[in-house]
């Protein structure tokens, strides 16, 4: 089963009949329009390419305009691709709604996390801070030793150090689907998802469900 592309609206909460509060993220999943269907003969694999939303005409490049025109769909804000399982069939120009998830219990949500800029090891990797007093001079939040010895005489790759934090692709797995509102194109999932309000999200049926 393929996934869909949506937009993060924000977080709220809903109550069950027993009065239990459930924190939910609201994802707006407008109709995903099929722009291309890839097959084994031409592309070496089976996949469906979709777009969603809209883009100003003066923002659409000529190659993009030709691609959308060939598919006979309105230019969207991007292009995304999902691999097709055996037996799944879609046609170019087809519209796929949030009702795709009507029978799905859990989903995986992929997005781009909020960028935090250049961060130190305490914020980025949860390092302990060093002594606040007792002879500590200007080394309260420094990482400490990062090296080895004359052998191997280098810092190993992957060493946790200061650097860019956030603004990377993140997937949160197995979130419960709380509600599917096909009338308003909304999907409510339990818990938080990556990214800022208004950012694009890829929602797929959970691989570990």
UniProtKB/Swiss-Prot annotation:
The keyword Ribonucleoprotein applies. The modification N5-methylglutamine is found at residue 150. PROSITE patterns: RIBOSOMAL_L3. It holds the Pfam family Ribosomal_L3. Keywords: Methylation, Ribonucleoprotein, Ribosomal protein, RNA-binding, rRNA-binding. Methylated by PrmB. Transmembrane segments: none annotated. One of the primary rRNA binding proteins, it binds directly near the 3'-end of the 23S rRNA, where it nucleates assembly of the 50S subunit. Belongs to the universal ribosomal protein uL3 family. This is Large ribosomal subunit protein uL3. It comes from Cronobacter sakazakii (strain ATCC BAA-894) (Enterobacter sakazakii).
């Amino acid at each position: 089963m393929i996934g869909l592309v949506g937009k993060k609206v924000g977080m709220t909460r809903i109550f069950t009949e027993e009065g239990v509060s459930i924190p939910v993220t609201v994802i707006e999943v407008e109709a995903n329009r099929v722009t291309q269907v890839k097959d084994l003969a031409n592309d070496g694999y089976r996949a469906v390419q979709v777009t969603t939303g809209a883009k100003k005409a003066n923002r659409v490049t000529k190659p993009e305009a030709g691609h959308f025109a060939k598919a006979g769909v309105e230019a969207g804000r991007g292009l995304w691709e999902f691999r097709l399982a055996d037996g799944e069939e879609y046609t170019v120009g087809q519209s796929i709604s949030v009702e795709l998830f009507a029978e799905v219990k859990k989903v995986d949500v992929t997005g781009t996390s909020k960028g935090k800029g250049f961060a130190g090891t305490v914020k980025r990797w949860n390092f302990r801070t060093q002594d606040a007093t007792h002879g500590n001079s200007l080394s309260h939040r420094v990482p400490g030793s990062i090296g080895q010895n004359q052998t191997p005489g280098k810092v190993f790759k992957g060493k946790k150090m200061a650097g860019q934090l956030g603004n990377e692709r993140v997937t949160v797995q197995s979130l419960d689907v709380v509600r599917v509102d096909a009338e308003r194109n909304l999907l409510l999932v339990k818990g938080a998802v990556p990214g800022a309000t208004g950012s694009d999200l890829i929602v797929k049926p959970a691989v570990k469900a």
